[in-house]
Amino acid sequence: MAPSLPPELAALLAPFCVTHEGPGPNPFPAVSLEGVHALARRLEISPAKSMALCLEHDVWPLRFARNRGVFLAREQRRLLESRAAVIGCGGLGGHVVTLLARAGVGAFTLCDGDAFDESNLNRQILCREAVLGRNKALVARDELAAIAAHADVRVFPAAAGPGNLPEILHGASLVVDCLDSLAARRFVAAAADAAGIPFIHGAVAGDEGFAMLVRPGEKSLEALYPDRAPAFENTFDGGGAQLRAGVPTLTPAAIAVLQAGLALRVLTGKKTTGARLCHLDLAGPMLEVLAL
């Protein structure tokens, strides 16, 4: 047990702790979900705050133990205390939400006005036959409850637009763009810039896709999608490009991994480089990083 933990709390957690030999340089204590809940009840705090308190004393929740070595305890705690706004809960968004939840992000705002249909079954991880016809954001909320019951989740089962974006982005640490409309992306990017939070873009068509971090004040999205560009010729414009090239099973999953990776770097305070576009072509396969 971590020596800095108050004796009363150390005694409470002891029956629920195991010693892990790794990952990381030294053995460390890890506490089970049952222990997290016991501490939450004793202190009358939420399970998320219970896990954050454990991490403050370098006691790792067992559910995050394999993250150690990649994240420091303080970085894992930052994730628990962060809120990710995910706009679009389909092909990209379903993967992004589940990846961030498993990594440890503690709060989400989910926005999507669409319902699942049969054409989504080939690629959208949250789409199952049992949920056809249900709103995507509401299904994502239910999935989060099953993966990470401690997560605080706000849901907007409606399309994002200028009228509701300030409310959607309120309190968010960053926003992840999982949309398929260039016009909607521009609205969300402008709202993120106005709110002073990072915007993580993702787009897919065929075997190819983009992922990009846009920090407040940067104009990378405008550089990638200039107004003068023909909407259906040279850009990943969402609906147009997808109608031409299709959206197979693998591409959304791969681009969502890149988006989630960028989000985790931002949320944990790791060094990030803006004005860089990650272009993935699974037909190669090839990954290139381009300066904008």
List each model region and its residues:
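Core catalytic loop region at the nicotinamide-binding pocket of NAD(P)H-dependent oxidoreductases
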Residues: 270-282
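Glycine-rich adenosine-cofactor-binding loop
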Residues: 77-115
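Hydrophobic residues within alpha-helices
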Residues: 96-97, 140, 188
